[in-house]
């Protein structure tokens, strides 16, 4: 397995949504609350740091990437970009700009640009076997709230 770091703006990740598998077999489904999604978007709009995303490079005809770690964050970004939910009703201004209770489509152009150009830190895994990816997934999730059954399902051969 080869691992390398990369950085891509959100706009690039948005364009690759159809080529990205957010839920390979070892992943759990979407579980983030609206409040968690809103906090992530607020963090991005304030240009604060978020954890890196781990993606497995695949070439299976359907997808180019599988999400190893960061699925919940990636889904939240995609959904906000499609204006499927709004920022928090009590979100504080970003600079002089009010952002409370706004969908992406309602943001002023400068904040749309800021959101779209926000750099996501990626770790790309190339030539990784399913066993290697599942092992990495378990290790990355070790400190999170994965349930015992989810952890068992992620183990190779389960």
What is each of the regions a protein language model found here?
Residues 1-7, 11, 24-158:
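Basic- and aromatic-enriched surface patches that contact anionic nucleotides/nucleic acids
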Residues 18-19, 158:
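A short, charged helix-loop
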Residues 13-15:
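N-terminal intrinsically disordered, low-complexity segments enriched in P/E/S/T
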């Amino acid at each position: 397995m080869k691992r390398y770091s990369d950085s891509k703006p959100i706009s690039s990740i948005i364009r690759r949504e159809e080529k990205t598998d957010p839920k390979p077999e070892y992943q759990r489904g979407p579980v983030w609350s609206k409040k968690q999604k809103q906090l992530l978007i607020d963090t991005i709009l304030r240009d604060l740091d978020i954890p890196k995303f781990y993606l497995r490079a695949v070439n299976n005809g359907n997808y180019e990437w599988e999400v190893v770690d960061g699925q919940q964050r990636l889904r939240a970004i995609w959904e906000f970009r499609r204006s499927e939910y709004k920022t928090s009703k009590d979100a504080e201004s970003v600079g002089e700009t009010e952002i409370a209770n706004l969908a992406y489509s309602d943001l002023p152009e400068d904040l749309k640009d800021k959101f779209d150009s926000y750099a996501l830190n990626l770790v790309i895994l190339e030539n990784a076997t399913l066993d290697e990816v599942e092992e990495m997934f378990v290790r990355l999730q070790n400190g999170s709230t994965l349930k015992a059954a989810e952890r068992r399902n992620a183990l190779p051969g389960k």
